[in-house]
UniProtKB/Swiss-Prot annotation:
It catalyses: dTTP + H2O = dTMP + diphosphate + H(+); UTP + H2O = UMP + diphosphate + H(+). It is found in: Cytoplasm. It comes from Shouchella clausii (strain KSM-K16) (Alkalihalobacillus clausii). Belongs to the Maf family. YhdE subfamily. The active site is at D69 (proton acceptor). This is dTTP/UTP pyrophosphatase. GO terms for cellular component: cytoplasm.
Amino acid sequence: MNTFLLASSSPRRSEFLKQCHYQFFTQPSNVEETFDPTWENDTIVKELARRKAASVAANHPNAVVLGADTIVVHNGKHLGKPANVAEAKTMLMALSNSTHTVYTGVAILHGNKEHVFSDAAKVTFDELTPERLERYLQSGDSLDKAGAYGIQSFGAIFVSRIEGDFYTVAGLPLSKTAKALEKFHIYPNIG
């Protein structure tokens, strides 16, 4: 059985793989998350996921390596991870009472074999009251997530509707990822 590496420091992606009974090691990548602004959104997340996986695979040539990347797009603008609370507040106010799209790209590499895909989901936020927004910002939950919220945590209180896969919004579309991992003979460890 091949070693399976998650090229991510995301505690959410790690937790999702654990709850699905995958055995893996975590090896964060050190990749600049820059991209050509003319790229399509699905191209951005696929390319960044591939770069993350490739940077880890370069040091672990016999391992199956999974990289992932997520972006939030609202009115044509990319919302990455906020640099500070003020930026998080600006992002969340923009998302208030509107719909945005979350794109997640996944890349799985093993030697010369590569499988890269993306998925998208639409998320609609309720109108954010100043009180709810301030409580959320005080929690610290906004600073390490694209778009300044985590749908799988405290940020769920803002969401009124999802069109698409919840796990795509959370950062790792599990059903599609599981099918892709099977192509590399990586399966949940049930026994």
